[in-house]
């Protein structure tokens, strides 16, 4: 996950404009069905904070990002919010959470990096913790705007998560095109 796209102020501003009408409200509705309100949540890759704000209406959310530019933006827009600088692979924090959420973040990880992240997610979750992650559906990988994008299938996600989580569901959904995305919900085992 070493791309430079989210590291500059100009690229962060470009992303905010491009993604201004995109949010994970439908994903969060699914998350809410499995995790009680007021639970502690880590959002991996909060970006401009669009989903963080929605999550924060229901949960005690700690946002995170690996981009200082996004973190500066998040803190300036949400001065009372809790935010951490975290790498999505190592997730170096001593904090524990009831749930972990990400929206189109973990697809930037290579398969081996995703496995490392999955192990670490399991470690920082409380007993019976819930994860909710979205991915682009497809095969293979590509470099897009200097960032690695790894596409996934139900099979690849099952393989990556099954040793650490009870998979509650993996559903196809539409973000831009019919069934272009996958939503994973799982419980720590």
Walk through the language-model features, giving the residues of each:
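Class I (Rossmann-like) S-adenosyl-L-methionine-dependent methyltransferase catalytic domain
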Residues: 1-42, 47-92, 109-116, 130-189
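A conserved beta-strand element that flanks and buttresses the S-adenosyl-L-methionine
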Residues: 101
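Short catalytic micro-motifs in class I SAM-dependent methyltransferases
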Residues: 104-105
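A short glycine-rich, Lys/Arg-flanked "PGG" loop and its adjoining helix->strand segment in the class I
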Residues: 115-127
